[in-house]
């Protein structure tokens, strides 16, 4: 919500009617909108064109028309002379919204440019694992239904610092039982009903030990498993071996706490929140697949207050009745294959390989 005085913006606040944020701005946006962006002397208002060598800080002001025309001409020249695949488009989490993220993707896909895939150095393991299990990695939970959650299991995330909206409305206000699994006693963990402070790298073992308790205590949703789960019987021998005592030897978590967490989660409706930190370790993808057993075995998916949450995509949720209108994702099936972000330092050393890096 933009507040004006005498025709000038003087304050920007969050919209309390927004179905996901319910009002607060994240700290980054709050500081930006109400700080440097309001001070015209603290930010660029016009395009600047470099007039000297890189690093000399020599620029001259040009108009928007001049800037757009020159950029368009240079991209066109590169596409005609060297091929549009020599134009590289890189992006990351600062531009992951519907407009700021997907519109540039459409533009560069239309040009035939090469996308630098940021997830290859970051979140790809988690996305790939969840797609293997559920078919999709970003539409597993409708945030508007958080009020129905009876238990929220936060695994490898610290929303008190990195997700203030959901920390306030999901973890603090709705009365759900909060379980945090994290080697570090974060602020979120300290405020939780139960903190399982496992040894680093033993997450998959803990997931299997919890699955053992769920099966042993008759908490498997047999109807859901019968209708929607493939491969359960093949997994049973492994689950049966992973007792809470075995889990304690691997993770350092006492059996009683493993059992308490498993029962609370199975009781539901439960949300499984998988943080980015969880998959940024050796075998991170398989760790995600192990954790994904829990909603599959207990039927905690596809109903209000239940599901899995990992970097949910606003536009993707929209197609399933979520917080934004449905939006067609940009497709680049006919263009050049994306390149890994990890390969860019070497590629940038070859002027013939990269003609433009945006």
PLM regions and their residue ranges:
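N-terminal export/assembly segments and adjacent metallocofactor-ligating motifs
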Residues: 1-219, 227, 235, 246, ...
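Generic recognition of flexible, low-complexity loop/linker segments
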Residues: 75-77, 139-143, 258-262, 305, ...
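Intrinsically disordered or highly flexible coil/loop and linker segments, enriched in small
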Residues: 80-84, 219-220, 241-248, 267-271, ...
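Conserved short loop/turn motifs at secondary-structure junctions
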Residues: 88-96, 250-253, 275-282, 314
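Non-catalytic, well-ordered alpha-helical scaffold segments
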Residues: 105, 204-208, 233, 259, ...
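Non-catalytic, charge-rich alpha-helical accessory subdomains
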Residues: 253-271
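A glycine-rich, hydrophobic/aromatic-adjacent loop/helix-cap motif
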Residues: 265-358
């Amino acid at each position: 919500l933009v507040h004006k005085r005498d025709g000038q913006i003087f304050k920007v606040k969050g919209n309390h009617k927004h179905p996901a944020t319910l009002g607060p701005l994240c700290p980054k946006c709050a500081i930006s909108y109400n700080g440097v962006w309001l001070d015209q002397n603290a930010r660029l208002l016009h395009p600047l064109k470099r007039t000297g060598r890189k690093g000399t800080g020599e620029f001259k002001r040009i108009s928007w028309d001049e800037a757009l025309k020159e950029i368009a001409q240079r991209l066109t020249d590169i596409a005609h002379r060297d091929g549009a695949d020599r134009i590289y488009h890189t992006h990351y989490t600062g531009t992951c919204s519907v407009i700021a993220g997907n519109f540039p993707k459409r533009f560069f896909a239309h040009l035939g440019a090469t996308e630098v895939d940021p997830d290859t150095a970051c979140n790809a393991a988690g996305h790939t694992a969840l797609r293997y299990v559920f078919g999709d990695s970003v539409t597993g939970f409708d945030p508007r239904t958080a009020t129905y959650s009876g238990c929220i299991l936060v695994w490898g995330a610290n929303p008190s610092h990195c997700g203030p909206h959901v920390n306030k409305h999901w973890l603090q206000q709705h009365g759900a039982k909060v379980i945090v699994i994290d080697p570090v006693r974060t602020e979120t963990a300290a405020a939780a009903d139960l903190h399982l402070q496992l040894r680093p790298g033993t997450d998959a073992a803990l997931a299997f030990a919890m699955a053992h308790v769920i099966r042993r205590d008759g908490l498997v949703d047999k109807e859901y498993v019968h209708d929607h789960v493939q491969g359960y019987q093949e997994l049973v021998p492994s689950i049966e071996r992973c007792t809470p005592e075995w889990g304690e030897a691997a993770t350092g978590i006492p059996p009683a706490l493993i059992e308490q967490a498993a029962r609370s989660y199975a009781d539901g409706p439960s949300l499984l929140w998988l943080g980015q930190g969880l998959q940024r370790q050796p075998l991170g993808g398989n760790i995600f697949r192990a954790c994904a057993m829990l909603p599959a075995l207990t039927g905690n998916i596809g109903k209000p207050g239940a599901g899995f949450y990992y970097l949910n995509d606003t536009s993707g949720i929209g197609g399933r009745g979520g917080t934004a209108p449905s939006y067609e994702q940009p497709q680049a099936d006919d263009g050049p294959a994306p390149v890994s972000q990890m390969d860019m330092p070497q590629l940038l050393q070859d002027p013939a390989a990269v003609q433009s890096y945006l």
